[in-house]
Amino acid sequence: MNRVLRCLFVLSLLICGAVPARAGDDRSLERGAAIIDPAILRELDQGRLGLGRLLWPERSVSLPLPNRELFGLPSMLPVREALEREFDRYVGRHKASLPNESIGIGDDYAFQLFDRGLFESPDVRFVLSGIVNRMDRAYVAPASCGEIRLIYRLTRTDMPPIGENAVSQRLPMTLNLVLKARGDADDASVTCREIARRWLAARNSPPMVGKLFGKDGPLELIGPANIDRIETNLQIAHAPKSAVRDFRTDYLLKVFNYDRAAKRFAEAPMENQIDRDRVLADEGLRRDFKAWLLDPAHFAEFDRGTLLIPEKFLANGAVAPTPVGFDVSDLQPEFGLVQGEGTDKALFSENDVVGALKKAAADGTRLQNIQSLAGFERRLNDVTCAGCHQTRGIGGFHFPGVDWMAAKPSNSTVVPASPHFFGDQARRREILASFRDGKAPDFSRGFSNRPQLRGSTELAGTEYSDGWGAHCYLPGAKPTETDRSFRGWTCAEGLACQVAGQTSRMGMCFIKSR
């Protein structure tokens, strides 16, 4: 393992292993857009928001739904079958590209696979580990006012925590049940403004299940009728013993839309997950995608982070390798699409991007993020599902979730969400406030590496923005050597940007050396 990746790996252990010392002072970052109180989640999981109650509402018993029953449901069979196909493809690709690296279940293998037998185990189930308000995504489907996400973590139930500080036996897979914030059957009085008001009002009172589900509560309006899709994220393999992929871990991402007429989930294209290999290999798709993305209106949305790429360019699944480091590499989902990325079939040249920037300036379009070829390249990766999950995550997760089954859940040292998640809370709450106040929300977002300046006061000095461990950019000795897309990525006082790549000036904020 090279020095940079070793540093990243150690840092990830530090982030995963302990809550920052001032976490108690930063509770405001968590409030208003997420429910992560352990006691509340326990009660909700055992009640109305247990996964079985939502996916099988006709079930006569309220007992938790183990995987054996979950993946046996007619609605979930397509999910199980699609995951099985992805496993087969992954193993096939591995054997073709790394024939000397063993792959299988258990410690004896160089690449250790996720055990597919867990899908039919009676001793494993998905446990509610967080509820996240994503009304900041209302630009995708305005009539639904965005989304409410119920995030469940796969957990063993046959191994109760033993010991004063024990944690539960959680497994590296999450299931995200995505609900419409405003259901199709809701009456006209249920507006985006009203839903946002309820969520923000919940910030000002102690969390209680009765209030959350009561009249005017933020959860009163959600139920099985709101289900839109399922998103799965699992650690398909990790390589602690590989001679060529030291500490490499791969995460499989999938999306399944709910077909209400058929009462089944169906494999679906992933939002903005560009099918790189297919697009590069097809002249028609190459031509169409290039023209579509460089169109001034689409380019402006691309800069703002609100772009929705047509499905014909998208993939139905993605594998996100971690860690990827700070340099451009073939581990990134869109490597090869931009000139200079090691291929002679690049889709976008520097002249293409410069031309789009000049056209935006001439039209009076104010771009917030993309000011250079490198900015275009970074945005092309972080609008994808895989690219976002590779950036400031905990492994390949942005929300590994609350462990309310731990012996002392309120004192658990497990971080429920990633720096990217917490750094985005100020933006999400501002959007909720705009909805509540009857204003047009600003849905734009910065790069996944750094939050927008709209939360600069609240985030200043934290690891979420410019504090210790934050992502940064080291300016060049001359102004002409500084990339305009990243010149604001500085470090807080007392810290310096330590470059962590071989070919870029990206790095992390650490204490200044003497």
What kind of region is each of these model predictions?
Residues 19-23:
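Sec/Tat signal peptide C-region and signal peptidase I cleavage site
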Residues 392-441:
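Primarily the internal scaffold of c-type cytochrome electron-transfer domains
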Residues 24-358, 420-421, 427-462, 495, ...:
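Conserved small-residue
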Residues 1-8:
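Bacterial N-terminal signal peptides that target proteins for export
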Residues 347-371, 464-477:
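Short, charged low-complexity linear segments at domain edges
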Residues 8-16:
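Bacterial N-terminal signal peptides
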Residues 457-514:
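Secreted, cysteine-rich disulfide-bonded mini-domains of extracellular proteins
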Residues 382-392:
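The canonical Cys-X-X-Cys-His
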